[in-house]
Amino acid sequence: MTRRPVALALLLVVLTGCSTGSDQPSSSSTPSATTQTTTSQPDTRTPKPPPAPGVDSCYRLSYAQAVAPTARTEAVPCRRGHTAETFHVGRLDRVLDGRLLAVDSHRLQEQVATTCPKLLGERVGGTEEQRRLSMLRSVWFTPTLKQSDAGADWFRCDAVALARSTELLELTGSLSGVLGTEEGRDRFGMCGTAEPGTAGFVRVACAQSHTWRALRTVTLPGSDYPGESAAKRAGEEPCKAAARTNAPDPLDFQWGYEWPTAAQWAAGQAYGICWAPA
C-alpha cells in the first residue's frame, strides 16, 4: 500500500437621429441662391432593452470566453458541437436603497456568482458528491455596460465541462441529467494523468486519457479552516478505506488525498478529494 497526500490544487441601442429636407425652387425665373437650414429633433423615445438570452441555448466558447464577465458570441444549435449550455436566466437585483447599482458592481457580481453554482445541479443532476467528483462547472455572464445602459437587467448561467484546467470539453446534445447516469459520470468524472502530487499530474475529465480517478470527497467540519495538518489528517483514513474497497487486492493498493488550502476554504471549498489508480 502506498499513499501520497498532497495539498489540493486550486480549481476552479445605439439610437441614430435622421432628418430629411426638401429644396424649394425659387418663384423667380431668374436663378438665385437659396439657403436651407436643417434641424434634427432629439429622439425622446425610451430605448428598448436588448433581448435576454434564452434558456437551453448553446454556445461555442473558449476557456477565456467562458470565464469572462460578459459574452458576445452567438448561440449555435445544441445538436452541433458546443462547449456551453445555458441552464438559467435570471434578473439582477439592481436597486439598493433607491439607488441603481452598476452592472459590474461587487454586489451584483456576487449575486450571480452565488446563484449559478447553486442551480447547476438542477440541470446536470446527480448528488452533491457526484457533482464534486465531476469536471462540470457553472460559469456566468451579465450584460455589457452598453447593454445595461440600454436597460438589460438579466444574468445568464451556463454549464461547461472542463477537459483539463484551462480547456473546455466539446459537447453534443444536452447536459440535462447527465450525472444521473453511469455513462455521464464516466465521461465527465474527475480523473488524473498521473498520481496526484507528482510532476505529471494534470486533472482531466475521465473522457480523456488518464491513470488515476477521484473516488470520494471528505467534508471537513466547522466554519473555520482547521489548519493544514488537521485538514491532512482528516482525509487519510477515509481515503485509504475508499481505495481499499476499489482495489483488486485489498492488501496491495495505492491511494492519494488532496486537502483544501486556506485560500480554497475561504472560497467555499471545505472538502478534500480521495484518489486511486483507475
Predicted regions and their residues:
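N-terminal export and membrane-targeting signals
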Residues: M1-L11
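Primary mode marks residue(s) on the alpha4-beta5-alpha5 output face of response regulator receiver
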Residues: S19-A278
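C-terminal motif of bacterial Sec signal peptides marking the signal peptidase cleavage site
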Residues: V14-G17
